[in-house]
Structure formats: C-alpha cells, structure tokens
Regions:
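A conserved short coil-to-beta-strand element within the FAD-binding core of flavoproteins
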Residues: 82-96
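Conserved beta-strand segments of alpha/beta enzyme cores
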Residues: 34, 80-82
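Low-complexity, compositionally biased segments
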Residues: 14, 96-97
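A generic structural signal for short beta-strands and their flanking turns/coil linkers
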Residues: 50, 77, 94-96
Length: 100
C-alpha cells in the first residue's frame, strides 16, 4: 500500500481510528506488519458517555477514555498515526494508493 504524501509502502493502512481500527492496528503491529492509522478524528465512540460492553471494563468506560487507552496501546507497539481524512482509494499497479 502506498501513502502518496509520504511515499511509504506499507503492509496495511487502517482507515479510521475508532475501536475497530485501533484493535486491528494493535494486532497487526504485534504480528510485525508495517501499519499506519489514518484518522479524521470523528469516531462515534467519542460520543458514548459510558460503554458497558467492553471487555476489561466491568464498570463501564467513557468512549473518549477507551479511545485514548486503545491509541496508547497501539502506539506502544509502534503504530503510526496521521490526522487526515482519506478522500480516495485506488488500485494502481497491484497496490492500493490512498489520497488524503
């Protein structure tokens, strides 16, 4: 995969830094895949005052706190982040090229 503004070729680019994207990026890095998360910063999880269906939080957790902790964990494995909105994904020469 190619991130045009950086010219980087990566195993995976995760579009979206919500709980699913952060979980994916953590596992990808744990399995030694090169990975970046591109996130516009509009995760719906931020709106959740208290989520009671997240493993490890039996008393619930605020969405913002959950995102902060998940991002810290992803960063601890070397996940890179870019605060951008992905506008287009195209396949070119056997690769995916993202425009942000």
């Amino acid at each position: 995969m190619t991130v045009p503004q950086q010219g980087q070729c990566l195993d995976v680019v995760v579009v979206g830094g919500g709980p699913a994207g952060l979980t994916a990026s953590t596992y990808l890095r744990r399995f030694h895949r090169s990975c970046r998360v591109l996130d516009a910063g509009h995760s719906r999880a931020r709106w959740i005052p208290e989520s009671n269906n997240c493993p490890g939080f039996p008393d619930g957790v605020a969405g913002e706190v959950l995102l902060q902790r998940m991002r810290r964990q992803a960063e601890s494995f070397g996940t890179g982040f870019d605060a951008v909105r992905v506008e287009c994904i195209e396949r070119q020469d056997g690769r995916f090229v993202l425009s942000a």
